[in-house]
């Protein structure tokens, strides 16, 4: 399996930030770009070869990563003028057609469990699998019963799914990209073709996902990354610190494990997920559980787990 990133967009709605760098090179925290995060995900999967499908200011990407970094070999396929994502994929196939491809749009950040995504996709009967996420309403929702207002919901998730910009494409499916189409983007050509042949699958996971397409999106992801550090198992974020009082927020992906050090009496609050916790004794945990601990503990999540630790 190889990794590939579609990073050729102009990022017009993010000007002037994209006047001198491509959108994928925008920082989501100090010295940590969108592309850094995506490559971090690839590295944690053990991917050794990554192809960057670039265009506008693509040389800036090559300057940052070079031919090899942190055990990953980079290949750059740069278009001098934008020809669409279909042509970008055709260029990739000319370079490599011997492996399955984990393809990403270069403007998304997600905490999805890539290991589970790859396991699901590679073992499925589908030629291509797409990560999907729930569509969020851009407006607040008013629930009515006749002419009576029953409740308000502020920008809830809707019962619709959208393309989240992460795709597992088996090498057998690469033939679809060589067919003749009347459009130049894979979303309006290859994907509908594969779906029509019932060879397209979907993978859903309820986790952070954000497409960074506007200043508002960028503000949201930068807020998320305040005091946050990513790890192969998830992330840790310092929420509060005053004297000896410290609160940390943790996110651990399912089928991972994490040992947590505490310096004294602490309270663990599970805000999502379920699994096993090992402290003075082994027991199951689930959402909304609150536990007191006085020594180091570890978790083995059965589901993606979010929890806070308040130390006194």
Cite the ranges covered by each PLM segment.
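A short hydrophobic beta-strand segment most commonly corresponding to one strand
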Residues: 298-312
